[in-house]
């Protein structure tokens, strides 16, 4: 099988040296992502496209899906590469490929040609289109808005029969821009802002301020791992967790009620800037949107920015909530955000929307900054790829089984789309489907006399969810890894 990768248009208008660098980086990213599916896979770069050739036909859908999620790709063409002799040979091959697809439909033919030939692209379009129209009685030519567009590419003595076109996410290849550190909470805003910077070519690391214990951190880990695995797995990234409960306690004790929200955000920026400096990261990313909450007015945002020289990027600054939720739905983080445990460690009864710098600084003089330094020093930093291994250690009390007993039921916790694409069928045991994002609200409705064996394809999500359910008091859960 063969795929032709078309570049994001902004790459094609770069200077020659920059364009070549971007293409080289994108080629490496594609190799890094796809090597998990087929080790014999070949990735070949050209000036205006990248070829992906693979032998394992069983991995076709997985490879195609992975390509649509790699930043830098505008669209993917799934093609059949065959030799041809003349224009009539092109027609015959097109007829064999498209006959069933064109029956009862309107169509047009579009041809791209490279190399020296005795015919032009328009001549091929007319010849092939006329032939298809004659040989398929129920088909009809329609040059504008047809039901089916027959795409053909002619390159020297090769014909590319385009079997399908699939849109990519566009943007720049990860690694073409510098690293950023996303302040992730697991909600709608921070997950979307992280995605937007990945799509723009940045390697996104994650910094999480834990205000609510292990369950909260587990939820945020799931979101960060999902974003990385889905859009950024070509690169290694860090997940840094900072226990911010001591900082919150100090703020509650020492800071005036109305100033708490701004002071908390300033402390988070200070801490994140220290982490960024430690790892050579150039900018912070937040999901703040103008006017969404009291701390996100222009006055307050300016005061928050003042505590650090590190650049703070806010890709959602002009977005409304509905737009952000729609983007979260598109990238697959909406369900995470809706079920994320929320912890409001600092709740002001009358938060200021126009903080005064002198007042904020006066309140912060009462704060013991050694507490902030200590929590940053003790921050837990892991390679995001190790989240699965670390989770396995943390859920050592949750048994992992490869078989099942008479009272066991397998619980498939994959997303609905994954379940539809690859339904799980195991002989000798019942299989129940309940997507991971519904476990927190729906698991209690299941038959608690049964032992539930949580299963997902890679085992990461099942272990995380098993730990979460254990913390909620459910002892009848195990992890199923056949």
From Swiss-Prot:
- What keywords are annotated for this sequence in UniProt? ATP-binding, Cytoplasm, Disulfide bond, Nucleotide-binding, Redox-active center, RNA-binding, Thiamine biosynthesis, Transferase, tRNA-binding
Q: What is this protein called?
A: tRNA sulfurtransferase
Q: What is the active site of this protein?
A: 456 (cysteine persulfide intermediate)
The UniProt function text for this chain reads:
Catalyzes the ATP-dependent transfer of a sulfur to tRNA to produce 4-thiouridine in position 8 of tRNAs, which functions as a near-UV photosensor. Also catalyzes the transfer of sulfur to the sulfur carrier protein ThiS, forming ThiS-thiocarboxylate. This is a step in the synthesis of thiazole, in the thiamine biosynthesis pathway. The sulfur is donated as persulfide by IscS.
EC main group? transferase
| CDD domains, sorted | PPase_ThiI, RHOD, THUMP_ThiI
Asked whether the UniProt record includes Nucleotide-binding among its keywords, one would answer yes
Q: Which family does the record claim for this protein? A: Belongs to the ThiI family.
Q: Describe the location of the Rhodanese domain by residue ranges.
A: 404-482
The primary location reported for this protein is cytoplasm
* Biological process, per Gene Ontology: thiamine biosynthetic process; thiamine diphosphate biosynthetic process; thiazole biosynthetic process; tRNA 4-thiouridine biosynthesis
């Amino acid at each position: 099988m063969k795929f032709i990768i078309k570049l994001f248009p902004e790459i094609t208008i770069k200077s020659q040296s920059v364009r070549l660098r971007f293409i080289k980086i994108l080629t490496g990213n594609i190799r890094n992502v796809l090597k998990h599916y087929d080790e014999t896979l070949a990735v070949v770069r050209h000036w205006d496209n990248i070829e992906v050739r693979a032998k394992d036909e069983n991995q076709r859908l997985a490879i195609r899906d992975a390509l649509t999620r790699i930043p830098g790709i505008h669209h993917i063409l799934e093609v059949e590469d065959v030799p041809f002799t003349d224009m009539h040979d092109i027609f015959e091959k097109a007829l064999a490929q498209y006959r069933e697809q064109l029956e009862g439909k309107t169509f047009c033919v579009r041809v791209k040609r490279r190399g020296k030939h005795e015919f032009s692209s328009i001549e091929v379009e007319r010849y092939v289109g006329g032939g298809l129209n004659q040989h398929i009685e129920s088909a009809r030519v329609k040059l504008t808005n047809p039901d089916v567009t027959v795409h053909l590419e002619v390159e020297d003595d090769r014909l590319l029969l385009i079997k399908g076109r699939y849109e990519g996410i566009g943007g720049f290849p990860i690694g073409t821009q510098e690293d950023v550190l996303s302040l992730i909470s697991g909600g709608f805003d921070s997950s979307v802002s992280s995605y937007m910077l990945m799509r723009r070519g940045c390697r996104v690391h994650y910094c999480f301020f834990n205000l609510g214990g292990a369950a909260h951190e587990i939820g945020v880990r799931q979101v960060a791992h999902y974003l990385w695995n889905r859009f950024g797995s070509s690169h290694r990234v860090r997940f840094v967790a900072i226990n911010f409960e001591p900082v919150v306690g100090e703020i509650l004790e020492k800071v005036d009620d109305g100033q708490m929200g701004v002071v908390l955000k300033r402390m988070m920026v200070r801490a994140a800037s220290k982490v960024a400096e430690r790892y050579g990261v150039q900018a912070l990313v937040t999901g703040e949107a103008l006017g969404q909450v009291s701390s996100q007015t222009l006055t307050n945002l300016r005061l928050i920015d003042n505590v650090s020289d590190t650049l703070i990027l806010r890709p959602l600054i002009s977005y409304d909530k509905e737009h952000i939720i729609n983007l979260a739905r598109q990238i697959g983080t909406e369900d995470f955000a809706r079920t994320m445990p929320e912890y409001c460690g600092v709740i002001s009864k009358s938060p200021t929307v126009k903080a005064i710098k002198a007042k904020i600084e006066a309140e912060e003089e009462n704060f013991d900054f050694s507490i902030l330094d200590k929590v940053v020093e003790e921050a837990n930093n892991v390679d995001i790829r190790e989240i699965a291994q670390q989770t396995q250690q943390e859920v050592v009390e949750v048994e992992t089984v490869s078989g099942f007993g008479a009272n066991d039921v397998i619980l498939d916790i994959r997303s609905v789309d994954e379940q539809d694409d690859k339904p799980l069928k195991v002989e000798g045991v019942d299989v129940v489907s309940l997507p991971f994002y519904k476990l927190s609200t729906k698991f209690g409705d299941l038959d608690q006399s049964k032992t539930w064996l949580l299963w997902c394809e890679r085992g990461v999500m099942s272990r995380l969810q098993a730990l979460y359910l254990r913390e909620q008091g459910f002892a009848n859960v195990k992890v199923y890894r056949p």
